């Protein structure tokens, strides 16, 4: 009996020591983040607030925090080990931070935050903890705005594609158009598909929401990927229909209302329609799976 009591006490002491290591590790992580990245984090939040193209960034840390919260009960039960292999990941993150600061690359500085956080998680929690939190860490990348050079490589082709698609649809409804680049010339007005109307804002936001949606409502990794990728053509088509609708309103309704109220309001409407289309895609995938299993 006494021997069993000693065994239980040793087990309790070991568990307490592991919990202490766990708490110490994450305390150091928080302190390091605040010391090294506080300025970058403040600037990132300001970017989310001031730039409508990346305003979805506010949702990402909330989602990542929720993922950690959901797993909170299982995390302390994992075997906590200090894994020094994670130091190499931290070192990589610090190299990216150095290159970002002295190479004047805000993107590298922000990416380094995720890399360092991943490395520290590996250091103080080992593979078991990193395995549990890998998606929460990976999803943080969605909160980081793309570099301007990559952003423009996406936005500019979207502008031309959207204007081209809308200019093909309008004549089908009796609206004569002449398109030059991203300019759509109607009988009474020229419509410019500017960067803000390229659809990249709704594309990035819808893609982010598709990732969240897939994580919560799908267990299959492949179907999660399909859901996320399907958000891209959905967002592009929705934006083209929005421009097309604006052209119809200019021609058959009121120019000022079309370019003002309708153009703004239709953005919200088409985004809700896009969410509905995402849900339909998911239902079709599930139905196809059921039919395939029955066959």
Protein language model features and the residues they cover:
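Hydrophobic N-terminal alpha-helices or hydrophobic patches in metabolic proteins across all domains
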Residues: 2-295
């Amino acid at each position: 009996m006494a021997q069993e009591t000693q065994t239980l006490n040793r087990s309790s002491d070991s568990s307490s020591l592991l919990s202490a290591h766990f708490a110490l590790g994450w305390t150091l992580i928080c302190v390091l983040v605040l010391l090294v990245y506080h300025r970058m984090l403040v600037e990132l939040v300001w970017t989310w607030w001031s730039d409508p193209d990346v305003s979805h960034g506010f949702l990402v840390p909330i989602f990542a925090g929720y993922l950690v919260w959901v797993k909170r009960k299982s995390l302390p039960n994992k075997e906590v080990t200090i894994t020094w292999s994670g130091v190499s990941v931290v070192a990589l993150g610090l190299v990216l931070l150095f290159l970002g600061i002295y190479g004047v690359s805000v993107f590298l500085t922000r990416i380094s935050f995720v890399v360092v956080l991943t490395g520290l998680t590996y250091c103080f929690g080992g593979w078991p903890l990193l395995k549990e939190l890998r998606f929460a860490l990976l999803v943080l990348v969605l909160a980081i705005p793309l570099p301007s050079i990559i952003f423009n490589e996406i936005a500019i082709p979207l502008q031309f594609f959207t204007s081209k698609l809308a200019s093909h649809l309008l004549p089908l409804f009796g609206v004569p158009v002449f398109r030059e680049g991203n300019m759509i010339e109607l009988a009474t007005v020229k419509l410019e598909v500017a960067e803000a109307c390229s659809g990249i804002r709704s594309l990035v936001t819808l893609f982010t929401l598709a990732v969240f949606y897939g994580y919560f409502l799908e267990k299959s990794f492949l179907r999660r990927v399909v859901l996320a990728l399907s958000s891209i053509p959905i967002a592009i088509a929705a934006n083209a229909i929005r421009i097309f609708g604006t052209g119809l309103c200019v021609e058959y309704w009121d120019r000022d209302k079309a370019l003002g109220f309708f153009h703004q309001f239709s953005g919200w409407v088409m985004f809700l329609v896009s969410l509905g289309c995402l849900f339909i895609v998911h239902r079709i995938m599930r139905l196809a799976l059921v039919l395939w299993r029955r066959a």
